[in-house]
Amino acid sequence: MNAEAKLLSVAQGREDFHRGFLALQEEHAYEVKQFRGVIPLDLEGTLFRNGPGSMNAGSEAYGHWFDGPGMVSAITFQSGKVHFKNRYVRTPKFLSDQRQGHITQRGFGTQIKGGPLRNLFRPISNPANTGVSWHGGKLCAFYEGGQPFRL
């Protein structure tokens, strides 16, 4: 492999990596019809996943991927079928950003407009975008720097 080809493969790898941070504005719920193999009939349950669903509020970009609003995805296996569903975690920060169309609360790596003094004593908001757990009959979304958010 020559140096030029190696550089292209590294650049392509970065492009693929960055594609994972593209915003997903839509929420979905559907049966997965196409997959390889057979789902065992006795495989039942739901796999939950949580992560930032968007990297912007309106036209403003979050300064760090830790600040994007949580989006919980559920993949459910039941009776040999697979269902997918995703929803944004409707935290006060998410609702405020959506309503106003821009970043309204300080994050881990994102400051609100107005400079350092406007951000100095404001707490870091909780986007509930890191983990998800079924506990005590309730589904909760987590963020390392804040309280769980019940869904």
What is the meaning of each model-derived region?
Residues 1-151:
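Beta-propeller domains
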